[in-house]
Regions:
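N-terminal extension/subdomain marker
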Residues: 1-153
Length: 153
């Protein structure tokens, strides 16, 4: 496998992208009000929030059973046709930062044998941000049973 390659990208067919989209799970960890507002915005609509565990919820009752709940929601979204598949692709994304600068990115398949978040291994791909290692086990548990992969779970 190449280090970075195209893959099938699933995009939501959502009519309400405001309900669908949320920021990465490792953001606003000390601001539960952000996540409460995201929950209210999503209501009962399909949402990325239903496919991830915000780190703000890690040490709350919401974390219990999250891995099973998320995997079931992923399966339901797949069965209900929530996504459209863009085969053998990359996805270009832009995010506007609070200071107005634009951060650009590419969603792709990555050979995880060539990735290191610690900065200590001689690999080709490294994390651009620090990783809080004690927050990894819940993400690993979610990925273990998940039929879909996301940049942030």
């Amino acid at each position: 496998m190449h280090i970075v390659t195209s893959t099938d990208i699933l995009l939501p067919r959502a009519e309400d992208m405001g309900a669908w989209s949320v920021i990465a799970c490792d953001q606003f960890t000390s601001e539960p009000e952000y996540w409460a507002a995201a929950e209210a915005r999503a209501a009962e609509k399909p949402s990325t929030l239903s496919l991830m565990l915000p780190e703000a919820w890690l040490h709350t009752a919401r974390a219990e059973g999250a891995d099973t709940r998320i995997a079931e929601t992923m399966r339901r979204y797949l069965a209900e046709g929530v996504f459209q598949t863009i085969p053998d692709s990359f996805a270009y994304v832009e995010r506007t930062l609070p200071d107005g600068r634009i951060r650009r990115g590419l969603v792709a398949a990555l050979d995880l044998e060539q990735y290191d978040f610690t900065g200590r291994l001689p690999v080709s791909v490294r994390s651009t941000e620090g990783t809080v290692e004690e927050r990894l086990p819940p993400r690993v548990n979610i990925r273990r049973g998940a039929p879909l992969e996301m940049p942030h779970t």
